[in-house]
């Protein structure tokens, strides 16, 4: 099975947080909403797809791509 790997980037600290996996960007945004539920200002945070993890082959493809700023992702998620 292929899992997408994501991380939250802290623009102020200039570093990525721990990896988490999700089926797609929509599911990842739900996880982000839960993780940042207590944070008052989500503007300094963004979500990146860090790559894929193939559980059958044990291979990680580390192609990094920007998913979106947390403020926009959470706003779009609330509208769904």
Q: Whereabouts are the PLM-identified features?
A:
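Short aromatic-glycine-(Arg/Gly/Cys) micro-motifs in beta-strand/loop hairpins
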Residues: 1-15
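Short, mixed-charge low-complexity intrinsically disordered segments
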Residues: 35-80
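Generic structural motif
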Residues: 11, 25, 52-53
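Eukaryotic short linear interaction motifs
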Residues: 15-16, 29, 56
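A short, exposed loop/beta-hairpin motif centered on an aromatic-Gly-Thr core
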Residues: 15-24
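Charged, amphipathic alpha-helical segments
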Residues: 23-34
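Intrinsically disordered, low-complexity boundary segments flanking structured domains
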Residues: 6-7, 32-38
């Amino acid at each position: 099975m292929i899992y997408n790997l994501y991380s939250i980037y802290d623009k102020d600290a200039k570093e990525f947080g721990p990896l988490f996996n999700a089926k797609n960007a929509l599911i990842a945004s739900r996880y982000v909403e839960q993780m940042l539920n207590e944070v008052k200002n989500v503007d300094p945070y963004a979500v990146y797809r860090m790559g894929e993890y193939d559980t059958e082959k044990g291979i990680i493809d580390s192609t990094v791509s920007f998913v979106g700023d947390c403020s926009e992702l959470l706003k779009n998620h609330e509208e769904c």
